[in-house]
Amino acid sequence: MVKAGSNAFRAHEKRDAIYKVSTFLVDNFWGNPPQMADALGVLLLIWNNALYRYGPFDFSALENTLRKNMSTLKSLRNRDILTLGEGDERTIESLFAAFLNALKIAEGKLQGRQSPVSVAKALHLLAPNFFALWDDKIAKAYGCHYSADPSGKYILFMKISKNMVECLRGRVPAPPPSTILKVIDEYNYAKFTKKWI
């Protein structure tokens, strides 16, 4: 079923080029916060256009958040979600809160609007085998809607994603630069967001 969802995603969505480019840019500019902020911006401004059409986030705030959290991000960069444990929750909560603030709309009529979706997308690009992707409909489908306690709901969603990876690893291919978490997101997007399957 996950493979069918991923195939449906790839048949309908041409935006995977943005994921590939953003992944490449983050890899290429890793350790350089201004360039990393630009790399994340490529994906966020396109993938989360529903929010950022009302106003951009502050790239300087994102750059500062990256700089302040670089050692933590380095420690998570090559982690696998299967290593997720209770001891990670405080770190994830802290990162989530920092990125939630950095990625809020900086100007315009929705100034200050925050996006847990943008946070998950940014964190995933920074540690693609550790942080899961979601959107509003996907979060609701898994009982993790984030209108209250977004970081806590994201941790719950990561635990659910970890269980899915445990079941799927080695059974569902993830062609580079995709990860098994990206393939699961493609399935979730096809099933819950677009209802293609």
Where in this protein do the model-derived segments appear?
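An N-terminal alpha-helical hairpin/helix-loop-helix interaction module that forms a charged
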Residues: 1-110, 128-197
